[in-house]
């Protein structure tokens, strides 16, 4: 952390870093003319469900007293604001008129996507729980988890998040959502590989 300069409490940093995308999406949805159309409204709820958990629940489940570099937090804020704008603008403003009708909710892509979304969310939440319960109080050593999805992949939490966003992209067929999938992969895959190499 010292090489990154100023830092903040990790829990506070997570809230400040993740909450902007929740708020940006809320603002864009509320000011759109399609906010209560069934499909856009459901897209909004799914997106916000993820980020409510990530912004306002996940940070307070963290253990330990680590700190987050201020620079990392600010970079996260910028990315999340831009991502929120990209996702919300497409879903509520730029999508072709008549694309997201009620009939969208009966398409195969919607149902496949929503199944993937909740499978990914379940994997992500369970994997986070496994990590939180790895160490006993006072133990500062690092361990590679062996439960749940960790039996098959090195970073079950990252895998779950990637599956979740693939599901969101499939259920919306949104170009913006697919861009986010690519970014998520580009961000998480190297981190997962680094963890794998560390414990090899």
Language-model-detected regions and their locations in the chain:
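Membrane-helix and juxtamembrane interface regions of eukaryotic multi-pass membrane proteins
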Residues: 1-75
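Glutamate identity and glutamate-enriched acidic tracts
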Residues: 18, 48, 89, 97, ...
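Glycine/proline-rich, flexible active-site/cofactor-binding loop segments
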Residues: 23, 50-135
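Hydrophobic transmembrane alpha-helices
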Residues: 25-32, 36, 79, 101-200
């Amino acid at each position: 952390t010292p090489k990154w300069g100023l830092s903040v409490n990790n829990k506070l940093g997570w809230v400040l870093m993740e909450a902007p995308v929740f708020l940006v999406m809320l603002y864009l949805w509320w000011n759109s003319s399609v906010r209560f159309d069934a499909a856009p409204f459901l897209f909004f709820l799914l997106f916000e469900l993820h980020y409510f958990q990530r912004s306002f629940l996940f940070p307070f489940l963290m253990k330990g007293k680590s700190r987050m570099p201020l620079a990392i937090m600010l970079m996260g804020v910028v990315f999340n604001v831009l991502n929120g704008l990209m996702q919300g603008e497409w879903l509520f403003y730029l999508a072709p008129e008549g694309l997201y009708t009620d009939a969208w909710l009966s398409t195969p892509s919607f149902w496949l996507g929503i199944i993937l979304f909740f499978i990914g969310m379940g994997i992500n939440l369970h994997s986070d729980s496994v990590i939180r319960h790895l160490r006993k109080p006072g133990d500062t050593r690092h361990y590679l988890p062996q439960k749940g999805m960790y039996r098959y992949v090195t970073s079950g939490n990252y895998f779950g998040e990637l599956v979740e966003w693939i599901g969101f992209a499939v259920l919306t067929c949104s170009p913006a959502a697919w861009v986010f999938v690519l970014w998520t992969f580009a961000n998480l895959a190297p981190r997962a590989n680094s963890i794998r190499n560390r414990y090899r």
